[in-house]
């Protein structure tokens, strides 16, 4: 559930229309830090999980498809009111993701990385941390419950990309064609409103 999986369902339709072949999307849930390994091992064709550009990652990069930011999610009853209040607090973020990098920029914060968002939010719910640093789209999903709220300020602004195995430029060209079509479509506007 989320922006990325819903967008990929649109891509499935776009690819089928464009190539006259019926594409069937198969989504695999995995830890963020395993996605590139799965790409390199030909276990998956593309990775889509809020990837931000990093030249150290040896993959093919699509055009950006979504602007986003890293934000702090806190328990509803927290007295944290701004990003400045995160100083010296215990923060949790996804290992290897930009949220972890953003958390490490907070002065004197004690930062822990966990493998997936569900573990992060469960730990926050259990009051093991003062705040979770996550992607804005993820945060919006979790603050729908009465359990959490989100700080208004972002810690980091970014662009999201789709990745493919290094050398798989054909797949990236297909993704870029879909991204262009998506960004010009009503589908994009609907998903932005939804998430």
Could you tell me what each predicted segment is?
Residues 22-37, 78, 112-126, 158:
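Short helix-initiation/N-cap motifs at beta->coil->alpha
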Residues 23, 101-119, 147-154, 179-195:
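Ligand-binding clefts/hinges and TM-proximal coupling segments of bilobed small-molecule sensing domains
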Residues 5-14, 97, 161-195:
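Extended ligand-binding regions for polar small-molecule ligands
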Residues 74-91:
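Flexible hinge/capping segments at coil-to-helix
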Residues 66-74, 136, 140-180:
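Periplasmic-binding protein-like
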Residues 1-49:
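Extracytoplasmic small-molecule ligand-binding "clamshell" domains
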């Amino acid at each position: 559930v989320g922006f990325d999986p819903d967008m990929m369902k649109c891509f499935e339709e776009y690819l089928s229309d464009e190539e006259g072949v019926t594409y069937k999307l198969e989504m695999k849930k995995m830890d963020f830090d395993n996605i590139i390994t799965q790409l390199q091992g030909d276990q998956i064709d593309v990775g889509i999980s809020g990837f931000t550009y990093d030249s150290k990652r040896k993959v093919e990069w699509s055009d950006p498809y979504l602007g986003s930011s890293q934000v702090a999610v806190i328990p509803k009853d927290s007295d944290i009111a701004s990003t400045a209040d995160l100083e010296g607090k215990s923060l949790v973020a996804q290992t290897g993701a930009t949220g972890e990098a953003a958390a490490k920029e907070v002065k004197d914060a004690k930062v822990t990385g966990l493998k997936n968002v569900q573990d992060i939010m469960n730990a926050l719910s259990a009051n093991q941390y003062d705040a979770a640093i996550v992607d804005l789209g993820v945060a919006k999903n979790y603050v729908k419950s009465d359990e959490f709220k989100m700080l208004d300020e972002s810690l980091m602004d970014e662009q999201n990309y789709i990745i493919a195995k290094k050398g798989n430029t054909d797949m990236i060209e297909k993704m870029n064609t879909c991204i262009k079509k998506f960004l010009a479509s009503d589908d994009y506007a609907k998903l932005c409103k939804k998430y």
